[in-house]
């Protein structure tokens, strides 16, 4: 069987030669043939089947074939680019729409409901937490008086914990202060008035039976005020830490600069002392040889200044005349 028969079949070849098809139909037929034989046979063999057609038809088919090849290469390049970039724009749009749909939408009714719940809530402040009482235990004890929302306890500082462990304390976590949110401000106020300065109670074998509550209701105080306060304290702590680090860095730079200056000054002094000793040895070579190690001159610089005689136009008396005048004065006195 010939190549044309393998591509199109013998019957299709006869029909194609006899019938007068339009250009669009010819293009579609060629595209189908090329797509079916693209993986097994080269496209150039298709032209051998059309030997009976005219030269004009062959030229038109060649043009269509070139156009199809260009289109196919462009499609393959775009598909590769889409695979490399992670998908086409349509796929990205679908992903974004899915993510948008997955986000839970809050209606105005829910927003209003949350606002009212926040307005109804009340917060109690505990200035002292019983030793080793965890937030879950605190919630369990106070939940019998009313519905509790959120609980926050401040753990002890690392310095206090380290000191406590050095003194033989327990390794369990201790808390210093805390805040408890009740869903009803009335319940929170009544609980604070009822339990303040009273024993925790419960079973006598309980760890916290003899401890005393120390709590206070905070009027017009909401949970977001607490979060804002904690955020402000953390920001202030970070700023102080940055300032201390910067100050320590400056002190270290100044210390290193002083060390370098001290080394430089020490080197200058050493060179000067060596130079002065050389000058002394050159000025008094005999004396330095005779001196012992204990009586050697010090390394300090010695300078000698020669006194010049007084120059004057007056006739200054000699030493003998001065002595004679002194004797005459003494004779008159005594």
From Swiss-Prot:
InterPro entries noted in UniProt: ABT1/Esf2, ABT1/ESF2_RRM, Nucleotide-bd_a/b_plait_sf, RBD_domain_sf, RRM_dom
Biased amino acid composition, Acidic residues: 10-25
Any one of the GO BP annotations: endonucleolytic cleavage to generate mature 5'-end of SSU-rRNA from (SSU-rRNA, 5.8S rRNA, LSU-rRNA)
UniProt keywords, alphabetically: Nucleus, Phosphoprotein, Ribosome biogenesis, RNA-binding, rRNA processing
Single GO molecular function: RNA binding
Record-level GO cellular component terms: nucleolus; nucleus
Region (Disordered): 1-25, 52-98, 275-299
Domain RRM: 122-212
Transmembrane segments: none
Assigned protein family: Belongs to the ESF2/ABP1 family.
Annotated function: Involved in the small subunit (SSU) processome assembly and function, and in the 18S rRNA synthesis. Required for the early cleavages at sites A0, A1 and A2.
Name the record gives this protein: Pre-rRNA-processing protein esf2
Species name: Schizosaccharomyces pombe (strain 972 / ATCC 24843) (Fission yeast)
Gene: esf2
